[in-house]
């Protein structure tokens, strides 16, 4: 059973980003009409080799709602727009910057993406 109390906290927000990560696709990372979801809540700071030189990089993932995009905790038809930008990487090192920044697809990635699309259409 889904948590229907979450619908009370939507406050007119009609955009749902189900895989927000560090919100890199957003110009306004605190858009007032959006709710940001992710399965992670973490801050990563480290030195990763770049094409120019070694540099310190920071990745901050702080979603409004911590959840899995394959099982969203919102009632059906709650949003007008759902943003779905899932991980694209299948093979990447455990500590690689790209993995920290964008996540990684698991072995069941086909089923995961299928279920994610289904949930995005539902909400």
Question: PLM ranges: what are they?
Answer:
Residues 1-123:
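Class I S-adenosyl-L-methionine-dependent methyltransferase catalytic core
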